[in-house]
Amino acid sequence: MVVEKQTKYEEFRLKRVEENKKRMEALNLPKLSQILNSTSVKISPMKKRSIPRTPEKKMVDVKRVHIQRRGVGKKRDLLNRVYVSEEIRDEAISRANKFQDELGSGYPSFVKSMLQSHVSGGFWLGLPVQFCKSHLGLHDGVITLIDEEGEEYETIYLARKNGLSGGWMGFAVAHNLAYGDTLVFELVRRTAFKVYITRVGSCGESSKDMS
């Protein structure tokens, strides 16, 4: 009985195998299986992402460079003369008035004591109104300032404002003018002044000695 059962089972198994084989052949599965087995799958390596490089920051040691201004070596000690007493300032005006009286040239002249606005900041020099009306005319123009060395400096005269504008700063800086210095302006030509400087606190010394 046992042998008979095994034989029937074997026949049934073989029959199923044959049926499955025929189905695979009908679907062309054997050939597909061979292709899959024979083909090697190539796996591409992962590409590295390019990360933008951050530029390196370098610390730079910047040294301060002191640039010396032109004419610093020729400056007088102006800081000590910014706030001179009225007594000292009046003494400089008195000496300038005396110098004016001794000119004896017959040319029109006037005395002008320097204020802060004349020698720093805006560098504007107002002239006596009556002197301007009498001797300088009603129109703007160029007025030349001649120092005691004979050097000439052109300035712009503004008739409506009765004063010197452009060019006056150059004269003031070139002669190291400071608060309290007193100037005598002598009109030697219609558009030219000879300028004499009395330094405040100079104790009678000439402007040449104090420059």
Swiss-Prot record:
Transcription regulation as UniProt keyword: yes
Organism the protein comes from: Arabidopsis thaliana (Mouse-ear cress)
GO MF annotations in UniProt: DNA binding
Pfam families: B3 (PF02362)
Keywords from the named record: DNA-binding, Nucleus, Transcription, Transcription regulation
Protein name: B3 domain-containing protein At5g42700
Cellular localization per UniProt: Nucleus
Transcription regulation among keywords: yes
Taxonomic placement: Eukaryota, Viridiplantae, Streptophyta, Embryophyta, Tracheophyta
PANTHER family linked: B3 DOMAIN-CONTAINING PROTEIN OS03G0184500, B3 DOMAIN-CONTAINING PROTEIN OS11G0197600-RELATED
Subcellular location, principal: nucleus
Taxonomic superkingdom: Eukaryota
